Amino acid sequence: MALQPSPLRVAMVAGEPSGDLLAASLLDGLASRLPAGTQYYGIGGPRMIATGFDAHFPMEKLTVRGYVEALKHIPEILGIRTELKRQLLAEPPSVFVGVDAPDFNFGLEHPLRDAGIPTVHFVCPSIWAWRGGRIKKIAKAVDHMLCVFPFETALLEKAGVAASYVGHPLADEIPLVPDTLGARRALGLAEEGPIIAVLPGSRRSEIDLIGPTFFAAIEMMQHQEPALRFVMPAATPALREMLRPLVDSHPGLALTITDGQSQLAMTAADAILVKSGTVTLEAALLKKPMVISYKVPWLTGQIMRRQGYLPYVGLPNILAGRFVVPEILQHFATPQALAEATLKQLRDENNRRTLTEIFTEMHHVLKQNTAQRAAEVVASVIEKRKARP
């Protein structure tokens, strides 16, 4: 009796909620490209697990923000990487896909690639924002890079790294014209009148650093415009509990806190005050005027500054190549500064029309059927590996 061929094995690691979204999109695409019975396993979050992914370790173990803040978690994170490397070298997968989390994944991809395991990395790290030493690390670790932004492929190919532009799955998921009224009805918000969405982050460290400033800014805006309403999504029950002391210390705010549904909350809004991150791209795809802010501990900020970061940190500005929305960062992010800038974004109709044009063009560029494009590249990498003598 002929032996049955072994099933394909796709190992994958995602270390952030945004990576969980990207990886789940890729898993959906791979399901239609690879044979039934293909095994998908590694480190992932709830969206990946919902597709049938076998998470050997929970993604939350890797979700640590900032240089200084990560120090106390380094032993556990390195232990997880060492154990996963041991497992993958003992039973090599058909391909390894690292999704974002470059500090963790490059250290895993390098020895896997040296052992002959094909490596694909989904989401190019910010080589265009930081000094270029990282690109040498990429060249040693990665067989093929999946890029979510169009300008990244040329930078990588110049350094000898195979790369494909696959677009961003958020651009496929979000409609070109947002349904603001429908979102308000779905959330039970007022159908008339101005609404500002406020997103201070999803980690305790973020809430501790910028939460009080955001709440003080809300209070100032409401004082200036009593008709204003605010909506704030809480991604988890734990985050809602983190926000409770801030809510209690600012009684009388016209603030609705939703259970998750961040995209719906932003869709319902006329303007957004948001902590920097992938969510700023989501806000741009929803065609919303916004103010981007963040605060990190002083030492982390100094390290970032010395690394040569771009003059802008928000993805809408990075993609546009100029400041199209304001960024108010670190000690400049006072309640008054945030309140004034956000109200200006809310009131300026000419700016709103200009941003809608800019963000619509951006949406078309990023809308590339990412799941299928990325899956095609991963499948081709597997085929090349199988064709080796």
Swiss-Prot record:
Keywords noted in UniProt: Glycosyltransferase, Lipid A biosynthesis, Lipid biosynthesis, Lipid metabolism, Transferase
Enzyme Commission number(s): 2.4.1.182
Associated pathway: Bacterial outer membrane biogenesis; LPS lipid A biosynthesis
Catalytic activity: a lipid X + a UDP-2-N,3-O-bis[(3R)-3-hydroxyacyl]-alpha-D-glucosamine = a lipid A disaccharide + UDP + H(+)
GO terms, biological process: lipid A biosynthetic process
A Gene Ontology cellular-component term: membrane
Keyword hit for Metal-binding: no
SUPFAM superfamilies found in the cross-reference section: UDP-Glycosyltransferase/glycogen phosphorylase
InterPro entries: Glyco_trans_19 (IPR003835)
Uppermost EC category: transferase
Family membership: Belongs to the LpxB family.
Entry-linked HAMAP family: LpxB
Role noted for this protein: Condensation of UDP-2,3-diacylglucosamine and 2,3-diacylglucosamine-1-phosphate to form lipid A disaccharide, a precursor of lipid A, a phosphorylated glycolipid that anchors the lipopolysaccharide to the outer membrane of the cell.
Name listed for the protein in its UniProt record: Lipid-A-disaccharide synthase
Organism expressing this protein natively: Paraburkholderia xenovorans (strain LB400)
